[in-house]
């Protein structure tokens, strides 16, 4: 589907049933509403008083139905860049990880800093915008829309495979960082302490499911193979 627009007939959606679909954007491509019901479609329409007032147009699908809901606030957020892809950008960063040590990869994975060489390069919610935070800006990846926050988690999973890190080890570190910050990560690395149980180890689904997708995708294609099959 991706960037192909599909008109949704009134019998399929219409003004009344439009509220029962998933992700809605306005004519500026800004996310206005997300309803979690298993429909990953992204629909565009005119909004008035937080309601869709005409027949929506399906412009694509999200990879995950809650892509445009901030896990921090529970609110819909973001903007969809229709037809724009980050496949090549994510693949390029993953290829870069082939020359990283684990320490270098960790340096590139912490929050991006524009004027510090390579710091946070893999934090694509900021690095993609050269320092401007774009956590919930949505772009195509594998033909589905993801946010840059999701993209960073997918990349992290891919990089873990490239670096030869078992998924459980990777996830324990991610959970420690999420739950305890840098000090939590240090505690985990020095004592083995974990901040939750298998398989999330203290992380949230917005990280876990996306990183698992990236990890499994990279396993399928080979740790150091840059010719990808979806």
What are these regions (language model features)?
Residues 2-19, 216-223:
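Short hydrophobic alpha-helical membrane-entry/anchor segments
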